């Protein structure tokens, strides 16, 4: 199973990027990061549509798509692990996560998603969400392996 993360914006060196790289390095599944940026100077819905096109083009065709969205489902770590385990056991080749820009995701991405996932009702910095997601994927992997990393 291959994991993909398509995200708007380029991560600068610093703690948020270090957090993502720390957990990506621990994963037993490969996690490929695709950073996308709109080159046109547009705003509002037009920007969200342009970012949607870039995000969807960055993920493999046929991949299971998980969109991080504040209006998505809030899953406990164990439930997230079960979901990943189900996809793994169904021989899903690619699972792609997408993180939108400051204005959020276009409706097109939300409709295309197999799962809308939220990290709670609060709004989080997009660069920090990358590290939080990588940690939750690592945690899920450890839960599925029966490893004591997760102590809920």
UniProtKB/Swiss-Prot annotation:
It comes from the Bacteria. It is found in: Cytoplasm. One of its GO terms (cellular component) is cytoplasm. S-adenosyl-L-methionine binds at residues 68, 100, 119-124. Its main location: cytoplasm. Keywords: Cytoplasm, Methyltransferase, rRNA processing, S-adenosyl-L-methionine, Transferase. Transmembrane segments: none annotated. Its EC number is 2.1.1.177. It catalyses: pseudouridine(1915) in 23S rRNA + S-adenosyl-L-methionine = N(3)-methylpseudouridine(1915) in 23S rRNA + S-adenosyl-L-homocysteine + H(+). One of its GO terms (molecular function) is rRNA (pseudouridine-N3-)-methyltransferase activity. InterPro entries: Alpha/beta_knot_MTases, RlmH-like, tRNA_m1G_MTases_N. Pfam families: SPOUT_MTase. SUPFAM superfamilies: alpha/beta knot (SSF75217). The keyword Glycosyltransferase does not apply. Belongs to the RNA methyltransferase RlmH family. HAMAP family: 23SrRNA_methyltr_H. Specifically methylates the pseudouridine at position 1915 (m3Psi1915) in 23S rRNA. Homodimer. This is Ribosomal RNA large subunit methyltransferase H. It comes from Rhodospirillum centenum (strain ATCC 51521 / SW).
């Amino acid at each position: 199973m291959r994991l993909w993360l398509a995200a708007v914006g380029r991560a600068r060196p610093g703690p948020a990027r270090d957090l993502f790289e720390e957990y990506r390095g621990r994963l037993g599944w490969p996690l490929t990061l695709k950073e996308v940026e709109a080159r046109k100077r547009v705003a509002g819905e037009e920007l969200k549509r342009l970012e949607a096109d870039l995000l969807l083009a960055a993920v493999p065709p046929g991949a299971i798509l998980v969109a991080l969205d504040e209006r998505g489902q809030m899953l406990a770590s164990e439930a997230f692990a079960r979901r990943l385990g189900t996809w793994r056991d169904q021989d899903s080749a690619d699972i792609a996560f997408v993180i939108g820009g400051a204005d959020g995701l276009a409706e097109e991405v939300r409709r295309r998603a197999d799962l809308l996932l939220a990290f709670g009702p609060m709004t989080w910095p997009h660069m920090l969400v990358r590290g939080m997601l990588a940690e939750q994927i690592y945690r899920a992997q450890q839960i599925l392996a029966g490893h004591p990393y997760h102590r809920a």
